Design a protein with these regions (language model features):
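C-terminal motif of bacterial Sec signal peptides marking the signal peptidase cleavage site
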Residues: 21-24
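Bacterial N-terminal signal peptides that target proteins for export
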Residues: 2-12
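Extracellular/periplasmic carbohydrate-active domains that bind, remodel
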Residues: 26-658
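Intrinsically disordered, low-complexity repeat segments enriched in small/polar residues
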Residues: 6-7, 19, 514
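Hydrophobic helical h-region of N-terminal Sec-dependent signal peptides
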Residues: 12-18
Length: 658
């Protein structure tokens, strides 16, 4: 069987997702049916992400032209025919990733070898409230000429909201007063019933200490520049009875977790809430949310702050685990110790009783922008069973906190992640979809639809990561035009066979990677860092229909440039006591125009019906290693062959050079 997977399937799936993101709310970007078809040489699918419009600004994003007759170097944005500016200059003011991306190409990777990336967002400012505007976008060529106009997109700013200052309810920004009650009262009073024009809770000033807070539909929480929302270090301020279950499973019930610092949860959470349970929530501002999870310094005696490649200060948090949390943690220590005092086993207490920064469940239309996210006791931002989610211009500073993912999407639909800076203690952007038979029994929805672009991934276990919870499938993910520098992995897919489901329809293109600490590409079902008891799925997990295109990788210090693994029926039976009817293998992976330099060799097994077209290596002897593969095609200047090998019949081949 030959691989027939191409970009059209993934492109179509993403187009459907983008339509949902644009039509999320009438007040934050008009639905896309006001557009006409644009010429192929013009930018495509211009839209305003749901809830990205406020009373005086809005955000535009778009896709590349379908065809480029000339080299595109930038994009120009027009409002009612008046030129507002160009995307790259605009991002200097609104994207924390942009200066790092510029520095990467100017200083870190200055020899011109790396894949260049496109920047495709624009923040329009100085707008009037409750006013409709018409925008078009043009591609700008190297000679300064411009493409035809995109289709016109019409979008309306929001009405001017009523503003509730947190201080009016007695909140004090002195860093010591516990403000939970005052802040919650401000939030509870901020309703459309009281303020039909919309309502915003504003936290401004200095450092506001608080326990768990709970948001509701149709509101904005803004943390102003200079203000910090600091998590209390007292477990009692995150009451377990207000917490949540990760999944609704009954065969192997999940333990209840405490609430996060910021929450959107039903009062009696049962492990699932459909999107639309809550609606239209914005969490924005130029301030900071600090979870107060860990002490400073990656190790004891280590630097609390380092100076990064841009000369900026980056906080460093303790790399720890269940055995060392008592010495290393703050909130993480106190929550774990409190759970152990209740009689919970120490590893379970550590895994299940630490608070994340945000747990946002069942939200239709969710917008996060501008904030700095720091030091969670557990995860960073978790968006569960939600729909139409945008993360724009966040700064994630959680390195090297244990389990400190940047953002995790679970069983959600339609996500946009752009202009973010990631320096995280775990995965930067992670996707999850349940595990085991429970994903089918409880009819969990797949994690479906994501567009990840124009981000700077600095540190993290993986930049773009799927799994290990793959039970209901993770699908329709596009990651393009990102820079990945010093992450452990670039594209990481992970699961365990009995978790089931898998990952499908992924497009990873036009990304630049440098100094990757481990593997640039990982596809593994032998993930062992997160083991959960579960009734096994009917079929073993699988990764399929993945396209990697126009990517450069310069430098890996430790492991394989591409790692793909699986397991035989016998291995799964021996390791997990589960007998499946087939091996756990992957299929329809296509790498095209991918260049490696100064990397380790590949290690590829349990792969079927896949292609490697114009994949080149510099300074990597014997770059290809295949075994237990079926109909894998190599097509480059050295090879034109299809490879099929048994498990004990490894073939080693030299790699082509560019």
């Amino acid at each position: 069987m030959r691989n027939t997977f191409g970009p059209s399937r993934s492109m179509l799936a993403l187009a459907i997702a983008l339509a949902g993101l644009a039509g999320g709310c009438n007040d934050s970007g008009g639905p896309r049916d006001n557009q006409q078809d644009a010429p192929a040489s013009a930018p495509q699918n211009v839209f305003v992400p749901a809830l990205s419009a406020d009373e005086n600004s809005l955000v535009l994003v778009w896709e590349k032209p379908e065809s480029e007759t000339e080299q595109v170097v930038d994009y120009a944005v027009y409002r009612q025919g008046q030129r507002l500016g160009q995307a790259r200059e605009n991002q200097n003011h609104f994207s924390p990733a942009k200066p790092y991306i510029d520095n990467f190409y100017q200083r870190v990777a200055s020899d011109g070898w790396q894949q260049k990336i496109d920047l495709r967002s624009f923040t329009a400012t100085n707008l009037q409230p409750d006013t409709e505007y018409a925008f078009t976008v043009r591609a700008v060529y190297a000679d300064g000429k411009e493409s035809p106009d995109s289709a016109v997109i019409k979008a309306r700013t929001s009405k001017t909201p009523h503003i509730i200052e947190a201080s009016t309810f007695g909140a004090k920004g002195d860093g010591t007063t516990l403000n939970t009650q005052a802040l919650q009262q401000a939030i509870d009073s901020c309703t459309v019933a009281h303020y039909p024009q919309g309502c915003k809770v504003l936290i401004s000033g200095s450092e506001f200490k608080t326990g768990a807070l709970f948001l509701h539909s149709d509101m904005t929480l803004e943390i102003a520049a200079g203000a910090t929302l600091l998590g209390s270090d007292d477990p009692a301020h995150y009451p377990l009875d207000k917490g949540y279950y990760l999944y609704p499973y009954s065969d192997h019930p999940q333990p209840r977790r405490p609430p996060s610092l910021i929450n959107v949860l039903e009062a009696a959470d049962k492990g699932e809430s459909p999107a639309g349970t809550f609606r239209n929530i914005r969490i924005v501002g130029q301030g900071t949310i600090d979870g107060n999870g860990w002490t400073r310094g990656v190790k004891s005696g280590g630097e609390a702050t380092i100076i990064d490649e841009m000369g900026n200060a980056l906080p460093q948090y303790r790399a720890s685990n269940a055995k060392k949390v008592g010495a290393d943690g703050i909130l993480a220590k106190h929550q774990t110790e409190a759970a152990i005092a209740e009689g919970i086993e120490s590893n379970s207490a550590y895994k299940n009783r630490r608070s994340s920064l945000m747990t946002l469940r069942g939200v239709q239309n969710l917008y996060l922008a501008g904030l700095t996210i720091r030091n969670p006791a557990f995860h960073g931002v978790m968006a569960l069973e939600s729909e139409n989610i945008t993360l724009n211009g966040l700064v994630h500073q959680t390195f090297d906190g244990n389990n400190a993912d940047g953002v995790e999407f679970g069983n959600s639909k339609n996500a946009l992640v752009f202009n973010n800076f990631f320096d995280t203690g775990d995965d930067c952007v992670n996707f999850a979809a349940g595990f085991g038979k429970g994903a089918e029994t409880f009819h969990q929805q797949p994690q479906s639809g994501a567009w990840i672009f124009n981000n700077y991934f600095r540190k993290g276990h993986g930049a773009v990561v799927t799994g290990s919870h793959t039970g209901a499938w993770i699908e329709n993910v596009r990651a393009e035009d990102n820079v990945m520098y010093m992450t452990d992995v670039g594209l990481r897919m992970k699961s365990r066979p009995y978790y089931g489901g898998g990952v499908r329809d992924v497009l990873f293109r036009h990304n630049a990677m440098k100094d990757i600490a481990k593997e640039p590409f990982v596809f593994t079902i032998k993930y062992s860092a997160d083991v959960n008891d579960t009734t096994p799925a009917d079929e073993p997990a699988q990764f399929r229909d993945v396209q990697v295109q126009d990517v450069t990788v310069d430098g890996t210090s430790a492991k394989h440039s591409i790692l793909i693994d699986g397991m035989t029926v016998a291995e799964m039976a021996e390791s997990f006591g589960v007998t499946y009817s087939r091996d756990a293998y992957h299929q329809n992976l296509r790498f095209s125009n991918v260049s490696f330099r100064n990397t380790k060799a590949t290690n590829i097994s349990f792969l079927h019906d896949s292609q490697f077209d114009e994949v080149t290596f510099a300074n990597t002897p014997q770059a290809w290693a295949f075994f237990a593969v079926n109909d894998v095609t190599l097509a480059d200047s050295l090879h034109q062959q299809s490879i099929t090998r048994e498990e004990n019949d490894k073939i080693i081949l030299e790699g082509a050079m560019k």
